[in-house]
Amino acid sequence: MSEPTETVWFAWVPSHQGALAHAALKGAGRLHQAVQPLNDENRVGFPLTQVLSDSERGTLANDGVHVHAIDQRTVQRRAAVDPHQRLAQAMNEWFEHHLGRSASEVERPHKWERLGELVLVPEGSFTGHGWDDVRQHDRAEALWADMAEALGGRSLAVQAPIADDDFRSPQLTLLHGSSRVEFTAHGIAYRFDAARVMWSSGNVTERRRIGQLDLSGETVVDAYAGVGYYTLPMLVHGGATHVHACEWNPASVEGLRTSAALNGVDGRLTVHHGDNAETMAGLTGQADRVHLGLLPSSESAWQAAVRCLRDSGGWLHVHMNVEEERIEGWVERTVDQLNGLSAKNGRPFRFTAQHLERVKWFAPRVRHVVLDARARPPPDAIRH
């Protein structure tokens, strides 16, 4: 004897009564919201959450509502709105079909990052109990594809620590699709290879702040341009007249140039490919503003930054990781150090701290901060 087929019960009403019936069923808690309604000529069928008794079906029939059971394999289920639910559903379907067991036995990612159509899950994902036979399965890539789709992407990769190389290259394990990404963030288009370019989504508030500065008429030097985290906001939103972007990772240079062209600002950008200790030397006296966005410290470029400023002075945006209780002292020491570098290099500036931005927690008790330091020449050096 064959096993009974599981069914879903549908309540059928004339189409013109659909809105009223939908509201009534939903209000009574009878509407099965994980299943799509059905349409049949002049009728609409609403899925029900439970089996109705003969007497209940008879009562509904007297009101013109006819209830029929339909094989659940033929109905269409709604895609879950919550991405966590969509991910769990995709995993369960693959596990049950290919392994004959539930995905509840394994730990699934609870957070992820999306760069365009690439979904990045944290380091260590898919390594715990129950994942060995999944990774070795000849249909594993179908699971990775389903998971990427469930999270709104088309590619899936696992993050890894930043490589210990000169370029601080990202490391990731690509499970499905391509590592090349294109996306728009805060009105700026980016395109680069995420396997070769570091991207920090956590600095979004600082990128927005820098983009909100009025840079019209200014020439800016970005000492650590990367793929354009700050260069592009300064050009697109800040309206900088020109940005000199210093970067030595070839993949970042490629991504920066491509992204600048996408945003139509490549005509106001000069990319200096190479070590900024050398490239910034060629920009002496040209900048109204220098951005120093390297963590954990940008100190190695401070002297070159002071030299880049025009004789009329300007601004330095100094990034640093600092222990919370030492921030005030760090600001004072940094200003003193910048003034010392000015004197040492024959630049008659007087630096003052104008603003300190606490960007985010980098580690317990350690903050990523940005000091906005203003450089002014002494009064007797100003030409009227």
Features from the language model and the residues they span:
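SAM-dependent transferase fold signal centered on methyltransferase-like domains
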Residues: 1-384
